[in-house]
Amino acid sequence: MVIITENITVSIMGNMKSTDREKRAASWDVAHFNWEKSMKTIYNYLEEYSESDFYGMHMPGHKRNQKMMENDLPYEIDITEIDEFDDLHHADGIIREAQERAARLYCADETHFLVNGSTVGILSAIMGVTDKQDQILVARNCHKSVYHAIYLNELKPVYVYPEYDEKTGLNGEVRVDDITLLLDKNPNIKAVMIVSPTYDGVVSDVKKIAEVAHVHKIPLIVDEAHGAHFGFHPYFPKNANENGADIVIHSVHKTLPSLTQTALLHINETSVNREKVRMYLHMLQSSSPSYVLMASIDECMELIEKKGEDIFSPYVDNLQKMREELGKLSYLRLVETSHYDCSKFVISVRNTNISSRDLEKILRRKYHLQMEMTSGDYVLGMTAVGDTKEGLERFTQALLEIDRSLSAMNKQRVWRELPRTRLCAKSSDVLHKKRGKFCGWKESIGKISMEYAYLYPPGIPIIVPGEQITEDVIAYLEMYEQLGYSIEGLEVDKQIKVWINE
């Protein structure tokens, strides 16, 4: 069989014959959806997708594995705050009991259910530990919601950049020494905000970073959205609560069997103003929280509490076998780092005759394997306890088969190191200005941005309002635009709105 991609024709060798799967693919393809002309509902599309044999190497963590979850959701239990069913915003009954169970499982002092995703947890945490105009130390590879909190509270960010691993092409961990240096140089910093693990699975030394923050008598907030499974098996790192973080945010839906949009915020025994964090949770979360989503979190916690070892042990066995098999790749390469979340599978295409976007298309179109993300020189596959042995073997064998059809090729590496920028004004100051104009990318160099620009996923800003646009920023944007990626956040294509300081 021959797969024709945008840049290259790849002959797929092996004994795969035409199957019903391939025939169904011809009549059902995500790319053929026409939302404007179709009368189908979102549910209709979801129903059709559920009947196909597409297997998801991506979140959410339940992986549509209904057999694992011993319950039936959702319409019959989709209620509101009626008698005996408690209230998320003033929990003192069944919701409080459920949150206390989650706190015990995660070794936290206090846990709150989030039905607006990790985003609302990050916003509430940052705004809860800072006051207007405060300084905050922020890892530059944090999610865009961190930058939105900075804007909302008119904060002055001090950035710490992650290491860049030239060998793997990944933005690495945040160095403890860098954080120590910046805290010593900026004594007015009121909090530290990092992301660990990153979208790619890189883990920072949260324990030592927490110790440094506490020496300076300030709290550490950890966006551990992608590490909701941490601490439940020795194959994975301890979670950030166990490592001394003051506030931790988990996206339960990303790597555990819970519905999309579900998350947790944990607060630990520190000097954090808990009332203020709770106040922002009440302000920013929906006043009509979904009981289906809350039930999903609670069912997930109960499953881990009662059957944690039963579900994690075979899952870890499958992961170890996968990594062993993928170590046999000749041209594609399974990326490994010293501090890594082994539930993630980063497959590098460096020095092969195929691009990451080509690989993603082959996996999707021929093998019906949908990846989580394509970025730079690699594709990212996410696994979770909801994965089946058969699904993971299918992913492994597809990569091995594709690998046999490839050859070596020296090619220009795709640059992923975050460009360094200079903060000239607070984002809140710039975004409140009315005077601005749109410039072409090249013309904008040296000017101050009034817009965010980022690739999504993972949602890490390349440029933030108030930062000076550099040649490196524009080179970064141009490279990804030429590779076919969508640059989000910019109002006008290939232009940036800049501040006119008159």
Residue positions per predicted region:
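Charge-dense polyanion-binding interfaces
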Residues: S486-E502
